[in-house]
């Protein structure tokens, strides 16, 4: 196949997307992805291994590039062939808008965030101290609580000084001979 669009250009510098666009324009009709890929491979002279390595990126590029359109059943065409009004593509959020048009619209109430809703007291924070559960029951008990405990500190003596040093007593200081020589001088 000879594509006049690429006359005088090095085939190794062409992208698969550019070649696919030229092939679709040359044929003038939609093609299956497999057939399109085979023709791109033949035109570029790439090996099966090279095409397999680049196949996922090529498919992604077809989807992302705005000049191609998927017609279903893995068939691809050029978007320029189809008038804008005739294209029936699913877009994000399109179904949601259709569903909203069919449903009757609810009236929305204005909500004042600063007014307490009397029906739903769970969300209201009560800052008043007039509730019996808010009373602090321990106000007078703090002074009496010290008398409830015995002073157990008398049971301990200062005999701890007579005990072995534990691991600290087993440690010895290390001195380098060089340090001792310097100390002697």
UniProtKB/Swiss-Prot annotation:
The keyword DNA repair does not apply. Residues 14-81 form the HTH HARE-type domain. Keywords: DNA-directed RNA polymerase, Nucleotidyltransferase, Transcription, Transferase. It comes from Limosilactobacillus reuteri (strain DSM 20016). Belongs to the RpoE family. Participates in both the initiation and recycling phases of transcription. In the presence of the delta subunit, RNAP displays an increased specificity of transcription, a decreased affinity for nucleic acids, and an increased efficiency of RNA synthesis because of enhanced recycling. GO terms for molecular function: DNA-directed RNA polymerase activity. GO terms for biological process: DNA-templated transcription; regulation of DNA-templated transcription. InterPro entries: Asxl_HARE-HTH (IPR007759), RNAP_delta_N_dom_sf (IPR038087), RpoE (IPR029757). The gene is rpoE. PROSITE patterns: HTH_HARE. RNAP is composed of a core of 2 alpha, a beta and a beta' subunits. The core is associated with a delta subunit and one of several sigma factors. Signal peptide: none annotated. Pfam families: HARE-HTH. This is Probable DNA-directed RNA polymerase subunit delta. Residues 117-167, 175-185 have a biased composition (Acidic residues). Residues 90-185 are annotated as: Disordered. GO terms for cellular component: DNA-directed RNA polymerase complex.
